[in-house]
Amino acid sequence: EGTLCVITEIKINLVPRPTMTALGVVHFQDIFGASDAVQHILEHDPSSIEIMDSNVLERSRQSAGLASNMGFIEGNPGAVLVVEFYGESETELTAKTNELKEDMARRGHGYATVNMLDRAAQASVWAVRKNGLGLLMSMRGDAKPLPFVEDTAVDPDRMGDFVRKFDEIVRNHQTEAAYYGHASVGCLHIRPVVSLKSQEGVNKMVSIADEISDLVKEF
């Protein structure tokens, strides 16, 4: 956002739609552990990695429309990484998801990995991810998770350090943030919880935005 470019010519490559997909949902105690694991998950060549923190997960559990979708969650994770793989057969996808699960256990990333080959089960996960924004905005009170530092993008290898520093800035302003987004490419939707119904809240938003702008430049 805010990037301007002029394109005079562009060639777009088309690829076949995958015959099958599978998910590995890796559970973590907090958003930092999830961020640290991304660089190692990328070694498995997934088609995508999406991140959701406890704000999204808890509100999904409390939602009448999504509570039944939450069977893929084990325990009370602080964050999950939804890792998607493409494949041509169930055998191929079983091997890929099992390799991910074994690697996460070997490296000590997360406390559980739930593998999913069933299409309906995968659709339940994506429904939670898709509806995350609406659920976040339903937070009670004047303070809401606001999109004024959306789409910060960093090298996935450095995501753990970036998220820790981002969180430090937010907490120094006596608030918290909701995290979700496209972890595989280092592009996160991080929404600090701020009220715009007071001058203090507006000042807080501006201050956080200034500090996050400087932080992104460091990375």
Model segments located where?
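Noncatalytic alpha-helical scaffold of FAD-dependent oxidoreductases
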Residues: E1-F219
